[in-house]
Amino acid sequence: MNNTTVTEDLLRTASRFWLMKSEPGECSIDDALAAPGRRVSWFGIRNYQARNFMRDDMTIGDAVLFYHSSCAKPGIAGIARSASDVYPDELQFDPESEYYDPKSTKENPRWLTLDVEALFKCPVVEIGRLREEPELAGMRVLQKGNRLSITPVEKEEFAFIVRNLL
């Protein structure tokens, strides 16, 4: 399947659309594409609003703009889809992990993750390029002060990006 077919299929079938940020040093689009089944766990979410988006709103098959953040060229680096229901992020229980949470228990985990399946890589659409498009002015990633690692994207915004910028 070519990239256009993949994105048009997502536009037809996805219930919701998301932008998910990952630091390339932690997990890049290349890492995700090289993973078994092109699936990676979206670990390390430690913001309640982002966690709640995953827990309450994301479903298997939702479309994802895979966004590289905290790097030289932040921007959309690929397209993915959510590939599992949420489950406890095991790193919250590991005292050696930077994601350890001493208040979290196996019986009552605070932090969740889900699997994301990478579909394809694209030339990075940098944040400055996104800002140039009036059709994208409402995207949360473009709002001043937004630091959430997972944000909803309107279907029309997703469609504009995949049809005009990728």
Regions found by a protein language model. Give the residues of each.
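Compositionally biased, charged N-terminal/linker segments
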Residues: M1-I60, E157-F158, L165-L166
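Aromatic- and Lys/Arg-enriched surface recognition patch
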Residues: G78-L148
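Residues in well-ordered beta-strands of folded domains
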Residues: K21, E117, T151
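Short, surface-exposed beta-edge/turn micro-motifs
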Residues: A14-F17, I60-A63, A77, W111, ...
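A general structural signal for short secondary-structure junctions and capping/turn motifs
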Residues: E8-R12, D56-M58, A72, T105-N108, ...
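Hydrophobic beta-strand signal
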Residues: L65-F66, R81
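Short, charged beta-turn/beta-strand-edge "cap" motif at the junction between a beta-strand
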Residues: Y67-P74
